[in-house]
A protein has these predicted regions:
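Acidic, low-complexity intrinsically disordered regions
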Residues: 1-233
């Protein structure tokens, strides 16, 4: 991958967010106890905010990338979580909308070493969701179609390829392991002149491991959580 991300060679960020019932389970995140759904919503909103700010220049927000956020939950429900329900929007369109804000409580270390809680405003485009099943396969098919449409455009032919993040805590309820691998392979087979689409799975787990594992090698991926093992093998 060598292509720089510019207005003439934009890229795309596509997020698939698990909103199934198990996302109501509590975890420790940033020093506070919250549900997995709340943690994922916070991470996603922070990422969207950072993407907007990184594209901001003196003349406004420049379209360095397009953004998609697909949620999957409920009774095989797959839908866009972006305001307005569009599958894919340029970053300037997201920035142009009034940003929903909620109050977030964070820990703040005082000069004497003690910890105090502080309330700060935080972006809230994405709301926490935890209900029903995990139609991951259908969500990834939706992601595949979004990525296929994006990479097929002549204007994107030489661009840095889309980056896909799939954030989940469990196994798909709408397909078997082989079907899941197949749709993932279909996503990774898409690309531009610069290279193939990057698919990054992020597994959210409570108490399975003492430390986060980033880009696991084969022996690291085979840890006790069988759901995570499938995502990384």
């Amino acid at each position: 991958y060598t292509q720089s991300i510019t207005r003439n060679h934009r890229t795309a960020f596509i997020l698939a967010i698990d909103g199934s019932g198990s996302m109501a389970e509590s975890i420790l995140f940033r020093g506070r106890c919250m549900t997995k759904a709340e943690a994922v919503a916070t991470i996603t909103n922070d990422l969207l905010f950072e993407l907007v700010e990184r594209a901001r220049r003196s003349d406004g927000v420049r379209d360095y990338y397009d953004i998609a956020v697909v949620g999957y939950s409920g009774d095989d429900e797959v839908r866009s979580l972006l305001p307005g329900g569009e599958d894919l929007v340029p970053v300037s369109a997201l920035a142009a909308q009034e940003m929903p804000v909620h109050t977030e409580v964070i820990e703040h270390r005082l000069p004497d070493g003690s910890i105090a809680l502080r309330e700060i405003p935080a972006p809230a485009w994405i709301k926490p969701l935890s209900a029903g099943q995990t139609p991951m396969c259908e969500a990834l098919r939706r992601v595949r179609d979004i990525a296929a449409g994006w990479t097929s455009r002549t204007a994107n032919a030489e661009s840095f390829p889309p980056v896909v993040f799939n954030i989940t805590d469990g196994e798909a309820t709408d397909c078997d392991n082989e079907e899941l691998r197949t749709v993932c392979d279909q996503i990774k087979a898409l690309g531009t002149v610069d290279g193939n689409v990057l698919l990054i799975n992020i597994h959210i787990a409570a108490g399975d491991t003492e430390r986060p594992v980033f880009f696991p090698e084969a022996h690291e991926a085979r840890y006790t959580n069988r759901y995570a093992s499938l995502l990384y093998l």
